[in-house]
Amino acid sequence: MITIAKDLKVNEQIRVRQVRLIGAEGEQIGIIDTREAMNMAREKSLDLVMVSPQAVPPVCRLLDYGRFRYEQQQNEKENRKRARSQEVKAIKFRVKIDDNDFKTKTGHVRRFLNEGHKVKVTIMFRGRERTHPELGERILVRVAETLADVGAPEGNPSMMGMDMNMIMAPKAPASPKKDKADRPEGDAGDTDMAAPAPAPAAAPETESAPSA
């Protein structure tokens, strides 16, 4: 994709006599008079945009500048949104943390995970606490278990200086399960078994006439 600065010259703002012209499909048209290039742009209902003013002669391109700027702005917006969603947040815990503080901090982690961010959970050790890394691991396990419904650890905890770190990543949304195809009530599926034939009706009993 071509990158065009917002302050580049367009159409009548271009004052040079000749330009090297690129067509709307990226084809090289060559060096032509600027007036002719502008006429070509008008005939195609496009704009003449100077994309490389430092070249000799300057390079111009035929394009719909308004549409191009809109697409550029949308791309920039999407890139900013993607960058924000990929940002790694950070929440710090102490080894000696009370239940209320733990609940508050895991609530922050949960919110970040729900927003699509990864979160670096850090356990900060003080003094002799560093000689008991199992205390930090215990808190990280508790964090992971508390947030198991929205995230999961990426790899194992790692020590860096006086801190123990663990990355929590948001869980991917679960794909919907496919339900079994509904069948009409009473439909037992395809069967080749024929229904049994009805039994023949019994002949009616007759009483014998008494002999004379």
Swiss-Prot record:
GO terms for cellular component: cytosol. Residues 168-212 are annotated as: Disordered. The keyword Cytoplasm applies. Keywords: Cytoplasm, Initiation factor, Protein biosynthesis. One of its GO terms (molecular function) is ribosome binding. PANTHER family: TRANSLATION INITIATION FACTOR IF-3, TRANSLATION INITIATION FACTOR IF-3, MITOCHONDRIAL. Residues 194-212 have a biased composition (Low complexity). It comes from the Bacteria. Belongs to the IF-3 family. The lineage of its organism: Bacteria, Thermotogati, Deinococcota, Deinococci, Deinococcales. Residues 176-186 have a biased composition (Basic and acidic residues). This is Translation initiation factor IF-3. Coiled coil: none annotated. Its main location: cytoplasm. It is found in: Cytoplasm. The keyword Cytoplasm applies. GO terms for biological process: ribosome disassembly. It comes from Deinococcus radiodurans (strain ATCC 13939 / DSM 20539 / JCM 16871 / CCUG 27074 / LMG 4051 / NBRC 15346 / NCIMB 9279 / VKM B-1422 / R1). IF-3 binds to the 30S ribosomal subunit and shifts the equilibrium between 70S ribosomes and their 50S and 30S subunits in favor of the free subunits, thus enhancing the availability of 30S subunits on which protein synthesis initiation begins. Monomer.
